[in-house]
């Protein structure tokens, strides 16, 4: 009698053969080169997930600047020539950026669709977010973040500021703790329950956030959250803390959160809270590793440390601000923060080396895509993808691309450099850690400002040094490739000590 395992093997083999004969997509005339992969449905997903950059480079060498890969049942057209990026964006009427992003958000955070076309919101949620993250609203948010960062950092100097001692800590852990607490209370307000209780609440939320963030890549990939018991529990606890009855007890809630609660008026309280959890994740998941890389690269480079410290001191002096341990926090306005080209260059260079975002748009109909390298037919529901890390690490655009150069984004006059070339042609898009076009991160201005504020305070309050002065740069954690800024695969110990103010 045929064994069950043998029968199962035969059935699997037959199914694979049927897929190869009937279900496998075939390249049509005028379409980009096609890679189906050898595993039904998964296609090339395993190879791409293992090392996206090398996978795309290999296919670029094999097929040229555009090719199609099957990934988890989707057909993705990768555009790898940065000279064609702006041409992709010119086809906006054929492309839908919302479908993928809103679907991924609903999967990961557990709320109903927040796409306005589905009727669950009273307004375009993306417009609401943009409106509350620019202009006067951004100024208020940045001022609150600057104050909260100082409230979080000041306990580091206690209890004997007259006899400062070195404190050793993991740099990523330090950045995670400081940025999470300051960012959380900036957006969602302070609970008037006393300092110790507030600190305990934040630490609990921090632990839950880490647990949830661990499983986030799997959720976006389509795995059900019930598979991850600890991560699922963490998500529900985080969302519970963002319910309306909890928020009403807090002081100084941001305009962003208040406006979103109004915009999501058709959702019940539980789903509103899960939508706000999406805001929490978006405000922390990339900012925290970005902050680490900026601080690490600055401390590691004596030239960067010297140039940054000089710029910070000059800016504070010009603004009439003095670092002290009294109750008066320092404050820099929008114009002053925007007039710091050295810090801007350090942040850009750090993000260039650590970002691995995937810019995605879905074809709304069959159409012809006209690029720098030719024209290609695209089918409805196919995905157009840009992977800017290819550009960020291109030696023709960025000589010696793996080396941190703090002044890479400064011109000969010390001003912001905006001119970069590929094959002798000026690039319109040369720096894309925050996406592009309609998919550009609406919180990018605030993210850069809070990182800049953190660096200003760290350089002003503390003497800083690495425990191992010649430590190697930690590898990037590739498990988050496609989601934004990659964290370090291991922490780096550093020491900080209060300056004699």
Swiss-Prot record:
Membrane-spanning intervals of the chain: 4-24
Alphabetical list of SUPFAM superfamilies matching this protein: Cytochrome P450
Membrane-topology descriptor: Single-pass membrane protein
Compartments reported by the entry: Endoplasmic reticulum membrane; Microsome membrane
Residues where heme binds: 441
InterPro entries attached to this UniProt entry: Cholesterol_7a_monooxygenase (IPR030681), CYP450_sterol_14alpha_dmase (IPR050529), Cyt_P450 (IPR001128), Cyt_P450_CS (IPR017972), Cyt_P450_CYP7A1-type (IPR024204), Cyt_P450_E_grp-IV (IPR002403), Cyt_P450_sf (IPR036396)
Primary enzyme class: oxidoreductase
Catalytic activity annotation: cholesterol + reduced [NADPH--hemoprotein reductase] + O2 = 7alpha-hydroxycholesterol + oxidized [NADPH--hemoprotein reductase] + H2O + H(+); 4beta-hydroxycholesterol + reduced [NADPH--hemoprotein reductase] + O2 = 4beta,7alpha-dihydroxycholesterol + oxidized [NADPH--hemoprotein reductase] + H2O + H(+); lathosterol + reduced [NADPH--hemoprotein reductase] + O2 = 7alpha,8alpha-epoxy-5alpha-cholestan-3beta-ol + oxidized [NADPH--hemoprotein reductase] + H2O + H(+); lathosterol + reduced [NADPH--hemoprotein reductase] + O2 = 5alpha-cholestan-7-oxo-3beta-ol + oxidized [NADPH--hemoprotein reductase] + H2O + H(+)
GO molecular function per UniProt: 24S-hydroxycholesterol 7-alpha-hydroxylase activity; cholesterol 7-alpha-monooxygenase activity; heme binding; iron ion binding
Gene Ontology cellular component terms for the protein in this record: endoplasmic reticulum membrane; intracellular membrane-bounded organelle
Cofactor(s) the protein requires to work: heme
Protein's UniProt keywords contain Iron: yes
Disulfide pattern: none
Pfam families in UniProt: p450 (PF00067)
Keyword list, A-Z: Cholesterol metabolism, Endoplasmic reticulum, Heme, Iron, Lipid metabolism, Membrane, Metal-binding, Microsome, Monooxygenase, Oxidoreductase, Steroid metabolism, Sterol metabolism, Transmembrane, Transmembrane helix
Enzyme Commission designation: 1.14.14.26, 1.14.14.23
Pathway, per record: Lipid metabolism; bile acid biosynthesis; Steroid metabolism; cholesterol degradation
Biological processes per GO annotation: bile acid biosynthetic process; cellular response to cholesterol; cellular response to glucose stimulus; cholesterol catabolic process; cholesterol homeostasis; regulation of bile acid biosynthetic process
Functional description taken from the UniProt entry: A cytochrome P450 monooxygenase involved in the metabolism of endogenous cholesterol and its oxygenated derivatives (oxysterols). Mechanistically, uses molecular oxygen inserting one oxygen atom into a substrate, and reducing the second into a water molecule, with two electrons provided by NADPH via cytochrome P450 reductase (CPR; NADPH-ferrihemoprotein reductase). Functions as a critical regulatory enzyme of bile acid biosynthesis and cholesterol homeostasis.
Similarity comment: family membership: Belongs to the cytochrome P450 family.
UniProt name for this protein: Cytochrome P450 7A1
Gene: CYP7A1
């Amino acid at each position: 009698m045929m064994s069950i395992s043998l029968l199962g093997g035969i059935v699997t083999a037959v199914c694979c053969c049927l897929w190869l004969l009937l279900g496998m997509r075939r390249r049509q005339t005028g379409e980009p080169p096609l890679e189906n992969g050898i595993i039904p449905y998964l296609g090339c997903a395993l190879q791409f997930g293992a090392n996206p950059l090398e996978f795309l480079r290999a296919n670029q060498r094999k097929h040229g600047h555009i090719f199609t890969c099957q990934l988890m049942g989707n057909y993705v057209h990768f555009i790898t020539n940065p000279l064609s990026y702006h041409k992709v964006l010119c086809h906006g009427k054929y492309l839908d950026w919302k479908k993928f992003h809103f679907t991924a958000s609903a999967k990961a955070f557990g709320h109903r669709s927040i796409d306005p076309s589905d009727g669950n919101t009273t307004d375009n949620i993306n417009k609401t977010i943009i409106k509350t993250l620019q202009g006067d609203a951004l100024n208020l948010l940045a001022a609150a973040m600057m104050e909260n960062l100082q409230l979080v950092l000041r306990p580091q100097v206690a209890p004997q500021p007259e006899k400062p001692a070195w404190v050793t800590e993991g740099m990523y852990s330090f950045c995670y703790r400081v940025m999470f607490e300051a960012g959380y209370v900036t957006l969602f307000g302070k609970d008037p329950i006393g300092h110790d209780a507030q600190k305990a609440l934040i630490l609990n939320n921090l632990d839950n956030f880490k647990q949830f963030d661990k499983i986030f890549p799997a959720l976006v990939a389509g795995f059900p959250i019930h598979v991850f018991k600890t991560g699922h529990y963490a998500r529900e606890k985080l969302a519970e803390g963002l319910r309306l009855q909890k928020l009403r007890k807090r002081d100084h809630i941001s305009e962003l959160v208040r406006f979103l609660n109004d915009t999501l008026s058709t959702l019940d309280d539980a789903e509103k809270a899960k939508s706000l959890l999406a805001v929490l994740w978006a405000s922390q998941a990339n900012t925290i590793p970005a902050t680490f890389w900026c601080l690490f690269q600055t401390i590691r480079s004596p030239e960067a440390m010297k140039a940054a410290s000089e710029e910070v001191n000059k800016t504070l002096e010009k603004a009439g601000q003095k670092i002290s341990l009294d109750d008066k926090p320092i404050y820099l306005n929008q114009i002053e923060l925007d007039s710091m080209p050295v810090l801007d260059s350090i942040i850009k260079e750090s993000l260039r080396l650590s970002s691995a975002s995937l810019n995605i748009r879905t074809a709304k109909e069959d159409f012809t895509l006209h690029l720098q390298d030719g024209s290609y037919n695209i089918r409805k529901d196919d995905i157009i993808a840009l992977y800017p890390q290819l550009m960020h690490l291109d030696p023709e655009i960025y000589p010696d691309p793996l080396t941190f150069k703090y002044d890479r984004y400064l011109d000969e006059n010390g001003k912001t450099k905006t001119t970069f070339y590929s094959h002798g042609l000026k690039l319109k898009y040369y720096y894309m850690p925050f996406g592009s076009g309609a998919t550009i991160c609406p919180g990018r201005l605030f993210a850069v400002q809070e990182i800049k504020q953190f660096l200003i305070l760290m350089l002003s309050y503390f003497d800083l040094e690495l425990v191992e002065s010649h430590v190697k740069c930690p590898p990037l954690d590739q498990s988050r490739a496609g989601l934004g800024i990659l964290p370090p695969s291991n922490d780096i110990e550093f020491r900080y000590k209060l300056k004699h103010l």
